């Protein structure tokens, strides 16, 4: 039998230790036995949102800025393939044209910042001359509502809009992104900066830059020589807002040089059959970033002026004047060292003027507009090749009116 002889001070220490040891057990027991609430009763909760009303004659799909940024390094046609009813026609490794329900080229209309894009869209190897990274929203519109943009919108339209200028934002804001692709060892960068001149009045501006550089692409087993590309883009916008008026002006430049695979230039049908039988090019050279003959070179300039006026009683007015210049040059391998002379050299100038009025009242919305389009196409002389597209001047004028009713 174990006997302990402790004085009163020692007994006090033992009792204190037992008390400290038992307190967590009691607390734990209290926590486990404490009732828990699986649900919380609230009073009335109202969740409200606004439904985007769309005409029964309009079928649209939108691509936001996040999706556009994530598609950096891809073509516009490749980006639009994610929209229902759309595909693309791809020529080579870079050129891609959007297709809406089997229609492409002049059967669909591309609208850039409020103006239709005028370029050489008749060829299957002519991609749209736009920098998709400069837009914050791309919308594909199909249906009867596309008719107001003209007869070229039979298949549908692709609306490309930048974000509004930051009139009410103070300080300098911007964003930058970069890419690198292993195929072709491509690298590129894109970004913009924007701000407002509060000290000078309600002015705002934005500058966007984009560049991309790539070398020869490759398949799983061999290189595709002379398939490099260069692209440099710039856009600048300036705006002023006061009361009911808003004025905006801007300029954009799109420059691109694309190499065409040398083995794709066939001299006759027998060479084509021989390449198909081999299943690969005959000659190979090491990887290079140099772009040699044959190649395509495109420069596209856009300058615009916009004026907006808002009035509560008479409605909203919008005027836009846009000038575009598209220069396309295509060089092939020619005999007698004449490769520097282009086989195709086209210069397309266009001037668009549009005036639109719209007003909403109760469940109705009225809209009317007029547009004047002047286009002039010129071929460079001395190429030694009969032009595919003749010289021409076109003047087109159109009017339209819309009346819509929206139910609750």
Residue ranges and their predicted role:
Residues 1-32, 42:
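Bacterial Sec-dependent N-terminal signal peptides
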Residues 34-36:
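Short linear regulatory motifs and low-complexity interaction segments
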Residues 38-41, 46-71, 89-92, 97-98, ...:
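Outer-membrane beta-barrel proteins, especially TonB-dependent receptors
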Residues 80:
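Active-site-adjacent helical/loop segments in soluble small-molecule enzymes
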Residues 83:
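Acidic-histidine catalytic/liganding microenvironments
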Residues 86:
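Hydrophobic acceptor-binding patch used for acceptor engagement in glycosyltransferases
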